[in-house]
């Protein structure tokens, strides 16, 4: 706050404390790579040890890995979407999560299907921007988001 005079929303992870408070349950964080999302990232986003989270990544999704290994290949988005749905269901059933946070900026297109399939609240970078725009005067004028 001392560095610049405007609010900064740098990560969708900033929504995790609110999701945990709203549901009273664990938040399932889905990220591109679980091994690269460290405890330090979580702490810097205000996710303390008292906030229950489960982090899962797309590290084992071959179709998702094409993004990095074979960037010129065509992706089958339905395969990625189905993988995410199965992951979300497992988080819901086995890990007892009450909400989902899509940490990667490539994941918002899948949010609605995850909501439909799990009936859980699903937040992502786009939902964070919508919230911000609704909070500021004149923010509703940004209809493109």
Regions found by a protein language model. Name each.
Residues 4-13, 27-31, 115, 119-128:
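Short hydrophobic/aromatic-enriched beta-strand-loop microsegments
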Residues 85-117, 121-123:
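Extended, basic/helix-rich recognition subdomains
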Residues 122-142:
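Short, flexible loop segments at boundaries between secondary-structure elements
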């Amino acid at each position: 706050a001392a560095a610049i005079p405007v609010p900064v929303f740098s990560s969708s992870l900033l929504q995790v404390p609110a999701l945990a408070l709203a549901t009273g349950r664990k938040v399932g964080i889905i990220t591109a790579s679980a091994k690269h999302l460290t405890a330090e990232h979580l702490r810097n986003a205000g996710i303390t040890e008292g906030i229950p989270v489960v982090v899962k990544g797309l590290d084992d999704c071959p179709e998702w890995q094409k993004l990095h290994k074979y960037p010129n290949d065509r992706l089958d988005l339905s395969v990625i979407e189905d993988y995410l749905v199965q992951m979300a269901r497992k988080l819901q059933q086995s890990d007892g999560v009450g909400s989902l946070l899509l940490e990667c900026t490539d994941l918002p297109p899948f949010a609605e299907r995850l909501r439909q399939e799990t009936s859980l609240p699903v937040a992502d970078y786009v939902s964070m921007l919508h919230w911000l725009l609704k909070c500021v005067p004149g923010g509703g004028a940004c209809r493109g988001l």
